[in-house]
Amino acid sequence: MTTTTASLVKTFLFRCDSFSSFKFKCKFESPAKTRLLSPATEKHVVRSSRAWRIRCLSDDPGSSHVFVASRRKMVVLLSTVQLLSHMLPQNGNAAEIYPVMQNEIRKVVTKGKAAGVLRLVFHDAGTFELDDHSGGINGSIAYELERPENIGLKKSLKVLAKAKVKVDEIQPVSWADMISVAGSEAVSICGGPTIPVVLGRLDSAQPDPEGKLPPETLSASGLKECFKRKGFSTQELVALSGAHTIGSKGFGDPTVFDNAYYKILLEKPWTSTSKMTSMVGLPSDHALVQDDECLRWVKRYAEDQDKFFEDFTNAYIKLVNSGAKWNML
């Protein structure tokens, strides 16, 4: 096959999600000089094509679909394919090991321990910096447990270690994957949304730099700027803050994942003279209702729990993919 004829560039094999066994292959064929039949003369003419052909092949040998794209669109497509390949499960056994992880996690993570496990996710992934793509979800939290901001997380990691030992007996998984799935299960255990998590993250062999997590004392403007550096919008900041609905921060039932966090924020109980209510939430929680842009989303989520669940799910998936290094087969 010469360079003037259609040639195979690369074949990609994808698994649609971590629960599906459906696969498809795409062959990217370079532009070729194509012999066409001219309707006017009924003669064959040679025309140099500027388009690329994408042939999608199913497991059925007799089934395929061909799409045609311009060179410019092909550049965009190839870039998108490369990006998506990092967002899809890289391990061929992901569909088999994922339910095992869920099962073992649920054996050790009770509703009372869910908040600590979810906090583990934020403290591992929250070190991500968009400008240099440093930090992020990489299991480095295991080396950072003595830091002041991570006090109390050693217990949560020990809880997950019990589940990880069982999972590793079947198939070794990274701490980054284990923490990501555990956070999702913690939300679900407490009545929150079911959040799908793809597998294939690699662990870091060293701790992330210090001082990358947002301090609890930040103002609203400081929070927005901090989350912006990590690639998150104000809406995503407010949605992710809803994780404080479980735990001991004082936002309703500590074992129920719902939108009580936002309803209580609007009541501003910390302004009361009562010693108990004055301790509700962190300064960073209080800051959300002192900023017009944040307040708009606080009100929206207080009124619509389904919207909160939807936006939290999307933001969580983004969080546990932030800065991830993926296992390339």
UniProtKB/Swiss-Prot annotation:
Plays a key role in hydrogen peroxide removal. It comes from the Eukaryota. CDD domains: plant_peroxidase_like. GO terms for cellular component: cytosol. It comes from Arabidopsis thaliana. It catalyses: L-ascorbate + H2O2 = L-dehydroascorbate + 2 H2O. SUPFAM superfamilies: Heme-dependent peroxidases. Its EC number is 1.11.1.11. Keywords: Heme, Hydrogen peroxide, Iron, Metal-binding, Oxidoreductase, Peroxidase. Belongs to the peroxidase family. Ascorbate peroxidase subfamily. The keyword Lyase does not apply. The keyword Amino-acid biosynthesis does not apply. GO terms for biological process: cellular response to oxidative stress; hydrogen peroxide catabolic process; seed germination; seed maturation. InterPro entries: Ccp1-like, Haem_peroxidase, Haem_peroxidase_sf, Peroxidase_I, Peroxidases_AS, Peroxidases_heam-ligand_BS. This is Putative L-ascorbate peroxidase 6. Its cofactor is heme b. Pfam families: peroxidase (PF00141). Heme b binds at residue 244.
